[in-house]
Curated annotation (Swiss-Prot):
It catalyses: UDP-N-acetyl-alpha-D-muramate + NADP(+) = UDP-N-acetyl-3-O-(1-carboxyvinyl)-alpha-D-glucosamine + NADPH + H(+). GO terms for cellular component: cytosol. Pathway: Cell wall biogenesis; peptidoglycan biosynthesis. The lineage of its organism: Bacteria, Bacillati, Bacillota, Bacilli, Lactobacillales. Its cofactor is FAD. Belongs to the MurB family. Its EC number is 1.3.1.98. It comes from Limosilactobacillus reuteri (strain DSM 20016) (Lactobacillus reuteri). It is found in: Cytoplasm. Coiled coil: none annotated. This is UDP-N-acetylenolpyruvoylglucosamine reductase. It holds the Pfam family FAD_binding_4. GO terms for biological process: cell division; cell wall organization; peptidoglycan biosynthetic process; regulation of cell shape. Its main location: cytoplasm. Cell wall formation.
Length: 298
């Protein structure tokens, strides 16, 4: 394989870079190559190169809702956090894929636009939020996104409407076409700064009171099974505090798995499988992961 640092001298690229330095869980082995594009043109150059050389491609944002295997990731991994511009025009906020959801909600608040308060504490990037239709406290990304710009694997760029994004529970059409989110536009409503801020502050206080924000985690691990709450099932199964290696079912919120002592991706996966098995045995309910598990599971 060619040396990508020589192929792309204008893009910061690292070889065999440990991904634990970038993930919220503080786990993950090395990426063969890790690139930090700063423009859409640079993203396209990388995507085109991967296609032409039949390489694998993994695209990450804030890496907040995923577990990267201890063996790392093959070929090229792109982190989009340097594509982080946020612009406000009238009642619309457009944010690049690498912008944080939190910063985007703050930009909306500062422009007295309401509709994004639910996302005030979601730690992910805009790209990840659109990719998985992130939501919290009764709100979902699908309710406020009017369109998104997506680069398809063949390098073409498309502007997809809300309908074309085909949002579902923790799902969008981008998961099906292997596209890369470049930006998203949110259609909001005029509001009052003080009211918007009060709502955001309230949700953040609730989040801090209930969630283990003081420890590394991948956020909410499981999707909500129909008719149930994953956290309650895990609590009722007596699994809070269950530990494998350095990963533990949070004693503060059963829906979270936290890294308490140099946990590995394998530790996280072991806890996930034990929770799934136990909940299935006790309640007959299948817990499906919301968190994405990617990379080499060595």
């Amino acid at each position: 394989m060619a040396n990508l640092m020589n192929e792309f001298p204008d893009i910061e690229i690292k070889q065999d870079e440990p991904l634990m330095n970038y993930t919220y869980t503080k786990t993950g082995g090395p990426a063969d190559w890790l690139a930090f594009p700063e423009t859409i043109d640079q993203v396209k150059e990388l995507v085109d190169y991967v296609r032409e050389h039949e390489m694998g491609l993994t695209v990450l944002g804030n890496a907040s809702n995923l577990i990267v295997g201890d063996g790392g990731i093959d070929d090229l991994t792109i982190i989009l956090t340097r594509l982080n511009k946020i612009e406000v025009h009238d009642n619309k906020v457009t944010a690049q894929a690498g912008a944080s959801y939190i910063a985007t909600t703050e930009a909306a608040r500062d422009s007295e636009l309401t509709g994004l308060e639910f996302a005030a504490g979601i730690p992910g990037s805009i790209g990840g939020a659109v990719f998985m239709n992130a939501g919290a406290y009764g709100g979902e990304t699908k309710n406020v996104v009017s369109e998104a710009t997506v680069m398809l694997p063949d390098g073409t760029i498309k502007h997809l409407t809300n309908e074309e994004l085909d949002f579902g529970y923790r799902h969008s059409s981008i998961q099906d076409n292997n596209g890369v989110v470049l930006d998203a536009t949110f259609a909001l409503e005029p509001g009052k700064y003080d009211e918007i801020k009060a709502r955001m502050d309230d949700l953040n206080e609730r989040r801090e009171a209930k969630q283990p924000l003081d420890l590394p985690s991948c956020g909410s691990v499981f999707k909500r099974p129909e008719g149930y709450y994953a956290g309650k099932l895990i609590h009722d199964a007596g699994l809070q505090g269950y530990t494998s290696g350095g990963a533990q079912v949070s004693t503060k919120h059963a829906g979270f798995i936290v890294n308490i002592d140099h946990g590995t991706a394998a530790d996280y996966v072991n806890v996930i499988h034990h929770v799934q098995k136990t909940v299935k045995e006790k309640f007959g309910v299948d817990l499906e992961t919301e968190v994405r598990i990617i990379g080499r599971q060595d």
